[in-house]
Amino acid sequence: MSEEQLKAFIAKVQADTSLQEQLKAEGADVVAIAKAAGFSITTEDLEKEHRQTLSDDDLEGVAGGFFCVQGTANRFTINVC
């Protein structure tokens, strides 16, 4: 269930400039922001997403911009462009 929650949260962030601004703030707590937005994700979900590599098919489907999760321990940042 958490993987689906993370994917839904990422989709919401890509469409919501308010969430993007919250996540861009220095020291933003991604898990807390997701929870406040109604999503249930964990730091483990973020770590797993960060380690995941894209397949050739995924790379072919990229239309621009990027999503990146960075950090250590409980501190993660999301870059949305």
Curated annotation (Swiss-Prot):
It is found in: Secreted. Cross-links are proved in vitro, when coepressed in E.coli with the ProcM lanthionine synthetase. The beta-methyllanthionine residues have a DL configuration (with 2S,3S,6R stereochemistry). Transmembrane segments: none annotated. One of its GO terms (cellular component) is extracellular region. There is a cross-link at C68-T72 (Beta-methyllanthionine (Cys-Thr)). InterPro entries: CHP03798_Ocin (IPR022516), Nif11 (IPR012903). Residues 1-65 form a propeptide. It comes from the Bacteria. This is Lantipeptide prochlorosin 1.1. It comes from Prochlorococcus marinus (strain MIT 9313). The lineage of its organism: Bacteria, Bacillati, Cyanobacteriota, Cyanophyceae, Synechococcales. The gene is ProcA1.1.
